[in-house]
From Swiss-Prot:
It comes from Uperoleia mjobergii (Mjoberg's toadlet). GO terms for cellular component: extracellular region. Its main location: secreted. Coiled coil: none annotated. Keywords: Amidation, Amphibian defense peptide, Antibiotic, Antimicrobial, Secreted. GO terms for biological process: defense response to bacterium. It is found in: Secreted. Shows antibacterial activity against B.cereus, L.lactis, L.innocua, M.luteus, S.aureus, S.epidermidis and S.uberis. It comes from the Eukaryota. This is Uperin-3.6. Expressed by the skin dorsal glands. The modification Phenylalanine amide is found at residue 17.
Length: 17
């Protein structure tokens, strides 16, 4: 869902920074 996608994006950003 949209929420799951948003959480995935947040996790990726955290990994990058």
């Amino acid at each position: 869902g949209v929420i799951d996608a948003a959480k995935k994006v947040v996790n990726v950003l955290k990994n990058l920074f």
